[in-house]
Amino acid sequence: MKDMKNIGRIVLPIIILLLTVRINAVPVKAFDMIVRNLPNSEQLPTKELLCIFQDSEGYMWYGTEGGGLCRDDGYMVKVFRSDFKNPGILENNSVTCITEDGEGKIWFGTKRGAYILSKTDYEIRALADETIKSWTITTMTATSDGTIWISTNRHLFRYNESGERTGKYILKWKGRENTVNSIYEDKKQTVWVTQAKGGLFCYDKVKDSFISYPWP
């Protein structure tokens, strides 16, 4: 019951804020919005982007549909993908999500497994976990304790910064197993996850398990 009261203190203000924003929303036409193309968009292998990430050094990383992983330093775009010149770099060139761990390594998911890129030599290695090598990675997040969370195929996995798996979780919402579509760490270093078809969960570090919370 104490946990339920605590979550109420967190979730209720958020709901009220969302309702307030919705009620007081100003029509989009009231804003002066300017949309510009990416400065180096002509250097991208494809115009279809699946995700965008800015690393700790300020560089932009783009995950593309079929074009691999792209790093933009503001002047040039470097592309990492498998092609006839560099076969075997990636099993699949569609990059679905990107994050950065505490050591500065870039982690990224594809439609066939996850990879780790070292920014010192740009070497890419596949995550050595046979379980997820053929699965589409839906989302990933690096948290402050050095954990990398990866969601795929209705499973949530936990890894350390060396790429070793340290946990596997199946989250059920109303009796159904669903894929996690977002992972968030709050200011208190608490990890929250949501599922595609409903479901809000909080990670309990002591019990190494997820607690389900009420959701409409």
Predicted regions and their residues:
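Carboxylate-rich, polar loop motifs that coordinate divalent cations or form catalytic acidic clusters
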Residues: 1-216
